[in-house]
Curated annotation (Swiss-Prot):
Catalyzes the formation of S-adenosylmethionine from methionine and ATP. The reaction comprises two steps that are both catalyzed by the same enzyme: formation of S-adenosylmethionine (AdoMet) and triphosphate, and subsequent hydrolysis of the triphosphate. Keywords: ATP-binding, Cobalt, Cytoplasm, Magnesium, Metal-binding, Nucleotide-binding, One-carbon metabolism, Potassium, Transferase. One of its GO terms (biological process) is one-carbon metabolic process. This is S-adenosylmethionine synthase 2. GO terms for molecular function: ATP binding; copper ion binding; methionine adenosyltransferase activity.
Length: 393
């Protein structure tokens, strides 16, 4: 059996780029909660002792940007300079302007257009992906890297590993074989964890705790063997982290946000963007489409692409590739997808309920992935029934 190795990485909620994603989406949540028609393009950057929020926002909501920044930093665990940032003492800069009227008239006609006539907020192409290798219909390498990162945060916050600090990165290499286009995991080849820690813990303690409390509960035993390689804090020291260690910026972890390098990516980031931005809403609808194709048994693996022009409601193109795993031709699956899913931005917003803020809805997406999550707020993860005739064996 010929196999190959594929690697996916993830980062924790305390990584500087992810901190910025979460702040941008916390701002979006606050705007949508008060004004569902808010137009939000919110960016965040951070470095030592400083967070800046900037961008274009048009909303009727009253937003305390500084409070959102400090609350988000605090909830992640940035409560002192020792851990990389002090939520209560850091400098917060705000530079928010209104959305360009040129963009506004082209996209939503200053709220005069019907939902089905609302144009895309920009040009671009987005991809959705699904694979039957996990219950989430997501790539195993990505799922494991993401869940290990989430587990690091869990054992830090519940006190299991008191030496942990907020920043951290994970990476998992999986050995696969290609079953006529479908990806079948064989084993976990390598696990890499680099996590921020305090001054008191030894490298031996770090390795022991990570294996026992992080890796063991997450990676199924069937994927581990005596050949699995573990790199646990291989640099030897990771005390300085968060914004003190590295600058952070919204939208720099787009592969971590999606499929861990599998499928494809059109390049557009998600966080801080309202649903008229098809970078986000378009990526959500094609994930639902790809997932529905696989969940309905039409294929074991699927990639769906959609593309847009600014101000134009109808997509320019829709594409489906099942990597040779489809039970019916891809062109027939494409026809079913186009009949089932409405790719117009205004209709995607309604069908996926993307104007609803609150409950930290979009902030939740900004750490540990936008896809493959079992959460009712992730409406794009709901499988739609597809009408098709399964070929007779």
């Amino acid at each position: 059996m010929e196999t190959f190795l594929f690697t996916s990485e993830s980062v924790n909620e305390g990584h500087p780029d992810k901190l910025c994603d979460q702040i941008s989406d916390a701002v979006l949540d606050a705007c949508l909660e008060q004004d569902p028609d808010s137009k939000v393009a919110c960016e965040t950057c951070t470095k030592t002792n400083m967070v800046m929020v900037f961008g274009e926002i048009t909303t009727k909501a009253t937003i305390d940007y500084e409070k959102i920044v400090r609350d988000t930093c605090r909830s992640i665990g940035f409560i002192s300079d020792d851990v990389g940032l002090d939520a209560d003492k850091c400098k917060v800069l705000v530079n928010i302007e209104q959305q360009s009227p040129d963009i506004a008239q082209g996209v939503h006609g200053h709220f005069t257009k019907r939902p089905e006539d609302i144009g895309a907020g920009d040009q671009g192409h987005m991809f959705g992906y699904a694979t039957d290798e996990t219950p989430e219909l997501m790539p195993l390498s990505h799922v494991l890297a993401t869940k290990i990162g989430a587990r690091l945060t869990e054992v830090r916050k519940n006190g299991t590993c008191r030496w942990l600090r907020p920043d951290g990165k994970t990476q998992v290499t999986v050995e696969y074989y290609n079953d006529n286009g479908a990806m079948v995991p064989v084993r976990v080849h390598t696990v890499l964890i680099s996590t921020q820690h305090d001054e008191t813990v030894t490298n031996d303690e770090i390795a022991r705790d990570l294996k026992e409390h992080v890796i063991k509960p997450i990676i199924p035993e069937k994927y581990l063997d005596d050949k699995t390689i573990f790199h646990l804090n291989p640099s030897g020291r990771f005390v300085i982290g968060g914004p003190h260690g590295d600058a952070g910026l919204t939208g720099r972890k787009i592969i971590i946000d999606t499929y861990g390098g599998w499928g494809a990516h059109g390049g557009g980031a998600f966080s801080g963007k309202d649903p008229t931005k098809v970078d986000r809403s378009g990526a959500y609808i094609v994930r639902q489409a790809a997932k529905s194709v696989v969940a309905n048994g039409m294929a074991r693996r699927a990639l769906v692409q959609v593309s847009y022009a600014i101000g134009v409601p109808e997509p320019l193109s829709v594409f489906v590739d099942t990597y040779g795993t489809g039970l019916i031709p891809d062109k027939e699956i494409l026809k079913i997808v186009k009949e089932t899913f409405d790719f117009r931005p205004g209709m995607m917003t309604i069908n996926l309920d993307l104007k609803r803020g609150g409950n930290g809805r979009f902030q939740k997406t900004a750490a540990y992935g936008h896809f493959g999550r079992d959460d009712p707020d992730f409406t794009w993860e709901v499988v739609k029934p597809l009408k098709w005739d399964k070929p007779q064996a």
